[in-house]
């Protein structure tokens, strides 16, 4: 799981959605137990702990720039950070990483960056 990842989809209250075109969501899980990344408009950081497939993320802190465009970027950012913090389990298959919430739902899917 350690390393840089690009987000491909996020679970929101109304279902799973792909990342909005023209935006980039990322997460880099460091060997020091810190996660950093881009939530589209802002950057974030915080602790994470991984024990086997069990995972806890957060609390996350982020910069607070306003998202002016594209449409929906602000909501996407809030949804991504909430989904990331909701993760309790991870599953990695090759270059794909899936984070699941406590209900067993896919919260975030990511592809290895690069």
List PLM regions with ranges.
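Lipid interaction determinants
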Residues: 1-114
């Amino acid at each position: 799981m350690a390393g840089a990842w690009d987000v491909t989809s996020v679970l929101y209250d109304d279902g799973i959605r792909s990342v909005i075109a023209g935006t980039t969501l990322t997460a880099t899980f460091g060997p020091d137990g810190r996660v950093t990344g881009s939530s589209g408009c802002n950057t974030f950081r915080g602790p994470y702990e991984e024990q086997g497939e069990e995972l806890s993320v957060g609390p996350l802190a982020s910069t607070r720039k306003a998202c002016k465009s594209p449409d929906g970027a602000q909501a996407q950012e809030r949804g991504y950070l909430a989904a990331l913090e909701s993760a309790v389990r991870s599953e990695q298959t090759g270059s794909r990483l899936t984070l699941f919430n406590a209900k067993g739902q896919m919260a975030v899917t990511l592809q290895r960056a690069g």
